[in-house]
A protein has these predicted regions:
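Short arginine-rich
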Residues: 44-54
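Short, tandemly repeated low-complexity microdomains enriched for cysteine and small residues
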Residues: 26-31, 52-58
Length: 59
C-alpha cells in the first residue's frame, strides 16, 4: 500500500491510497493545506503500515 498526494481542480490537496497492484483503495476528502493531508496520512500510516511510501505529485 502507498499514498499519492494530488491537487484537485480547485487547488486543494487530497490523497489516494493505492494497493501494491496500483488500484485505488480509497480517496480522501480535500484539504486546504498540504500539511493537513500529510498529517492525516501519517495518522493512517501509524495504524496500518508506517513504512508505506508517500508520493507527492504536487511538487
Amino acid at each position: 500500500m502507498y499514498f499519492v498526494i494530488r491537487r484537485s481542480s480547485n487547488n486543494q490537496y487530497y490523497f489516494v491510497i493505492k494497493s501494491e497492484n496500483h488500484e485505488i483503495v480509497a480517496t480522501s476528502e480535500t484539504y486546504i493545506y498540504k500539511a493537513s493531508a500529510e498529517l492525516t496520512i501519517d495518522s493512517i500510516k501509524r495504524e496500518i503500515n508506517y513504512n508505506s511510501d508517500v508520493i507527492d505529485t504536487t511538487v
